[in-house]
Amino acid sequence: MAADVLSDRLKTVRLTGAAFFEIAAEAPWAVASPPREMILPRILPGADHLIAYHAVTAGRCVANVAGSPPIELQAGEVIVFTHGDPHVMSSSPGMRADPPTTDVLDVAAAAQVPFLINYGSADAISAKLVCGYLACDARLARMLLAGLP
């Protein structure tokens, strides 16, 4: 029964845009996802609501969100930030990274998809991720995502 309610709600949410990129990283590494107010106008202009996601395709990593315990992820796992909150993906818990500058976001927006980000040597990659942002109507997103963290 609950699956039917979720299916009905998912049918009402229309994605209005998407952007994605790949990360190949050698430990130690850390990359910050900036606030949605910085991302939306550059990567998904005109979008109302931002959902960020990271799918670990190889190795391990950690998702760090201010005020929350780190979440360890391994290959095959996905983490979704339903409200597009700023966060840091890294090789170890508690690592920090400066958010990308607006110039970097502009380059990413103009780049061919997927945009590839390399940290370190290709011979010593400890993690690979497919990351991205989904845009949808804010009103419908609130209805669907209201009960999620």
What are these regions (language model features)?
Residues M1-A3, L105-P149:
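Alpha-helical bundle regulatory/interaction domains
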